[in-house]
From Swiss-Prot:
Residues that, per the record, bind phosphoenolpyruvate: 28, 101, 129, 177, 359, 402
Organism per entry: Rhodopseudomonas palustris (strain BisB5)
Group of enzyme by EC: transferase
Transferase listed as a keyword: yes
PANTHER family (UniProt xref): AROM/DEHYDROQUINATE SYNTHASE (PTHR21090), PENTAFUNCTIONAL AROM POLYPEPTIDE (PTHR21090:SF5)
Name of the protein described by the UniProt record: 3-phosphoshikimate 1-carboxyvinyltransferase
Pathway terms, separated by semicolons: Metabolic intermediate biosynthesis; chorismate biosynthesis; chorismate from D-erythrose 4-phosphate and phosphoenolpyruvate: step 6/7
Amino acid sequence: MSHSDQTSPLEARKSAALSGTARVPGDKSISHRALILGALAVGETRISGLLEGQDVIDTGKAMRALGARVERTGEFAWTVRGVGVAGFAQPEAPLDFGNSGTGCRLAMGAVAGSPITATFDGDASLRSRPMRRIVDPLEQMGARVIQSHEGGRLPLTLQGARDPLPITYRTPVPSAQIKSAVLLAGLSAPGVTTVIEAEASRDHTELMLQHFGATLVTEPEGAHGRKISLTGQPELRGARVVVPADPSSAAFPMVAALLVPGSDIVLTEVMTNPLRTGLITTLREMGGAIEESETRDDTGEPMAQFRIRGSRLRGVEVPPERAPSMIDEYLVLAVAAAFAEGTTVMRGLHELRVKESDRLEATADMLRVNGVKVEIVGDDLIVEGKGHVPGGGLVATHMDHRIAMSALVMGLAADRPVKVDDTAFIATSFPDFVPMMRRLGGELA
Ligand SMILES: O=C(O)C1=C[C@@H](OP(=O)(O)O)[C@@H](O)[C@H](O)C1
Ligand SMILES: C=C(OP(=O)(O)O)C(=O)O
């Protein structure tokens, strides 16, 4: 992304009651998958509601470089003409995934099942993130790392397998990115590729693979896990994909409306896949007034409308098994916890350390510089809620969109303004965050 050399700070101030109706942009996870499966399918895939954030745009560019035809046909409307399973062309230049772990890791899986060699790269944040977790299973399937930076990090050159082997793989951590990479590579292997996860992670890849014509069976595994078996070498056929609004983006106006007294907002068409709704469960346990209506399930993923009203929140304990269903939402939950009465304990957050930034440390710093008492104990985050937040701090974004948005939400309700050093990365996942929050009444300047 070119914006890493220009920073744009912003300040959020205590705002009057938020009101209005908004639809946040399309879901990021589904948008990446629609482009990648469209590129692996035969025929045309028509996507509506695609997230036009930089992360997804970078995935679209990579699919083009691998031989797919990717075109924008209208606002949030895109078509992809795919090359078929294992049909990727050799890219001429390194594939640049910018800030996006999802785009990069899912594309690695897809490339691992094609007889080509591709170099994967990204910005300084993505270059610092672990890739061994992805290439380990892909090497078991026959792909080979030709070159990588220290510790298996980007830039990394991967040679796809000529004859990929189907494997059974137990993911070492709950991660939809690892699971998806193995399944996408498994598309070109003969026989059944199986992924076993001890805790279920988001299942958009599984649902969309079936929508594109693959045969896949999901069974329960233990108390919270799943076993997913994909039959290899299907003919994927281009399909129509309707992308619902992203619950991870909806989280920001949702928490803002709970925190700013007297607020009353509506968020429409928010995806409600149960593997993504941990934040809503938690905010309701804290006493948040969140009403769901107009639930629909006609486009492959469920969605609903939410009315959110200003609420007095109380501290809660969030169990570790809930983490996969709200992994990207802990930053903004920590903000809600800071405004609650009482202590909130969020358990089992080790995966937060390997996101766009070390989100465990960054969240603690964000709260501390704004006068909130917070502690990290092992993998747990403990926030002492005092019913209000002093604010007045400058928050370091660390190339992480969710830190920037969380800090700005905090500033809308804190006693004194909260400033972030750089808002540029918000464009990776929620390009119209600032104008949308302003339309709802948020004071951002
Ligand atoms: O598969 C996906 O679309 C994603 C999976 C999660 O990452 P992990 O698989 O690393 O947990 C999440 O944090 C990311 O924003 C999107
Ligand atoms: C972790 C995230 O994304 P990614 O892994 O795709 O960079 C996120 O959007 O919060």
